[in-house]
Amino acid sequence: MSMRPVPGSLSSLLHLHNRQRQPMPASMPGTLPNPTMPGSSAVLMPMERQMSVNSSIMGMQGPNLSNPCASPQVQPMHSEAKMRLKAALTHHPAAMSNGNMSTIGHMMEMMGSRQDQTPHHHLHSHPHQHQTLPPHHPYPHQHQHPAHHPHPQPHHQQNHPHHHSHSHLHAHPAHHQTSPHPPLHTGNQAQVSPATQQMQPTQTIQPPQPTGGRRRRVVDEDPDERRRKFLERNRAAATRCRQKRKVWVMSLEKKAEELTQTNMQLQNEVSMLKNEVAQLKQLLLTHKDCPITAMQKESQGYLSPESSPPASPVPACSQQQVIQHNTITTSSSVSEVVGSSTLSQLTTHRTDLNPIL
C-alpha cells in the first residue's frame, strides 16, 4: 500500500485516538498545507476546527472514564463524534484520495475498537493502561514521517512541533494516567471501608446480643430458681439427716434400755447375794459357842489327841474368812458359785450335825 502525504486533520485524528481519556493540550500545533493537494488548506481548516471541537469534547469526557458509572454516557458521545466525522468526510470527497480514505477508515475502525475496549478497560487494573497505550504512539509517528520526507524544508519546520507535541503527550498522559487512578483506588477504598466498617460492627454486635439476652435471662431467673432449688436441696438434705439421726438415736435408746435392764438384773442379784451372806454370818455367829462344836473338837481329838483340839477351830475360821472374801470381791457368777458352795457346805454340815443331835 503506497503511503501518501497525510494532511493535518489525520494528525488531529491520531491525537484524538490517543487522547480519548485525556484533555486536549492548550495549544494544538499548526499544520502546513500540502502543496501536492490543491485546495487542501481551504478544505482542511474547517475539518481541523471540527476535529478540535470533537477532540476537546472527548477530552473533557476523558477524565470521567475512570469512573465506571459514567461509561454509558461517554459511549453516545463517541458515537456522535464518529457520526460527525463521517458527515464531514462525505461533504468533502474531493479533498481526500483513496489512500487517505483507507487510512481514515482504518482509524475509524481503531476508534470503534477503542470504544469497544473502553468498558473492558475499566475492569482492568492500572498496569493494563500502561501496556495498551504505548503501542499506539509509534503508529502515528510512522505515518507522519513518510509524509514529510519529500519536503525537507517543511519537515524541519514541522518536526519541532511534532516532537513538542509528542513530548507534551508523553508528559501529559503520565500526569493524566496517574492522577485519575489514585482517586479511583481511594474511592474504592472509601467505598469498601464504610462497607467493611458497617459489616464489622454488625458482626461484633450480633454475637453479644444473644449472650447478653441469655445473661439477662439468667440474672432474672436466678434469684427465684436458685432459691427454690436451694430450698429443695436443703430440705432433702435435712430430711435425710433427720432420718439418720432418728435411726441412730433409736438404736442408742434400744442399747441403753438393754443395758439398763441388765444393770437392774445384776443389781438385784447383788442384793440377793448380800442378803445370803448376812444370813450365813448370823448362822455362824449363833453356832460359835454351840456344844456341837465342842463335840466335834473332841471327836477330832480322839483321832489326833495332840493336834486335834487346837486345830479344830482353825478350819472353821479359815472357811468363814474365805467365804466372806469371796462374797465381797467376786462378781455375780462367782458369788453364785460361792453361795452354792457355802450352801452345800452348810447342808453337809447340817447333815453331819443332825445324826449327832
Curated annotation (Swiss-Prot):
Comp. bias intervals (Basic and acidic residues) = 218-235
Which Gene Ontology MF annotations are present? Answer: DNA binding; DNA-binding transcription activator activity, RNA polymerase II-specific; DNA-binding transcription factor activity
A single GO cellular-component term on record: nucleus
Q: State the InterPro entries in the record.
A: bZIP, bZIP_sf, bZIP_transcription_factors, TF_CRE-BP1-typ
Location of region: Basic motif: 226-246
GO terms for biological process, alphabetical: adipose tissue development; fat cell differentiation; positive regulation of DNA-templated transcription; positive regulation of transcription by RNA polymerase II; white fat cell differentiation
Q: Which domain of life is it from?
A: Eukaryota
Species name: Mus musculus
> Which PANTHER family does the UniProt record give?
CYCLIC-AMP RESPONSE ELEMENT BINDING PROTEIN
Mark out the compositionally biased spans (Low complexity): 196-206
Spans through the membrane? none
Similarity comment: family membership? Belongs to the bZIP family.
Q: Where does this polypeptide localize?
A: Nucleus
Main localization category = nucleus
Biased composition of type Polar residues is found at: 186-195
Keywords, in A-Z order: Activator, DNA-binding, Nucleus, Transcription, Transcription regulation
Among its keywords, does the record have Cytoplasm?
no
| Basic residues bias locations | 120-129, 138-175
The protein in question is named: Cyclic AMP-responsive element-binding protein 5
Q: Which residues does the annotated region (Disordered) include?
A: 114-239, 298-318
